[in-house]
């Protein structure tokens, strides 16, 4: 998703991945993804929903939003963005090897929102804070607190915006 948006607005250093599933530009949400894993018997499915603000974005009180066309001189077509996203996803998924997983993790680290900064987060309904140090090989966020290092998966954590 980050790669697709970068294709249109360029390699803006303010385009960040808010772990685990949002894309922000200038701290405003431009995209998000929802992932649902369904396991039943021998059947295993993953459903991914992706939203990218292209033509406009909702006005929200809880955080700022952005859309691709506000960064462009010439508006782009929604279908064009969809096709570019489709190609990018297909390219990542067709070679889903250890090498590809490491490349994706490296891209996440290079573009992570608040990496090497103190973050506020909620885990098990408890708000805490710590230094966002890293993302593990299993895509867990690694946070250094005053007393220890914590690894949390996306289902256990919510990063809080300032």
Locate predicted features:
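Conserved active-site carboxylates
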Residues: 22
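Long, positively charged amphipathic alpha-helical accessory segments at protein N-termini or as interdomain linkers
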Residues: 1-14, 25-162
């Amino acid at each position: 998703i980050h790669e697709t948006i970068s294709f249109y607005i360029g390699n803006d250093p303010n385009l960040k991945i808010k772990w685990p599933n949002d894309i922000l530009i200038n701290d405003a949400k431009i995209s998000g993804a929802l992932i649902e894993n369904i396991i039943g018997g021998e059947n295993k499915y993953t459903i991914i929903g992706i939203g990218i603000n292209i033509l406009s974005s909702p006005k929200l009180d809880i955080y700022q939003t952005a859309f691709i066309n506000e960064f462009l001189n010439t508006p782009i077509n929604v279908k064009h963005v969809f096709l570019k996203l489709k190609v990018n996803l297909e390219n990542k998924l067709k070679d889903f090897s250890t090498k590809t997983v490491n490349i994706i993790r490296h891209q996440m680290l290079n573009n992570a929102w608040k990496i090497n900064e103190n973050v506020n987060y909620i885990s098990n309904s408890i708000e805490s804070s710590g230094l966002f140090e890293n993302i593990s090989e299993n895509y867990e966020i690694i946070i250094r607190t005053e007393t220890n290092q914590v690894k949390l998966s996306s289902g256990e954590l919510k990063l809080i915006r300032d």
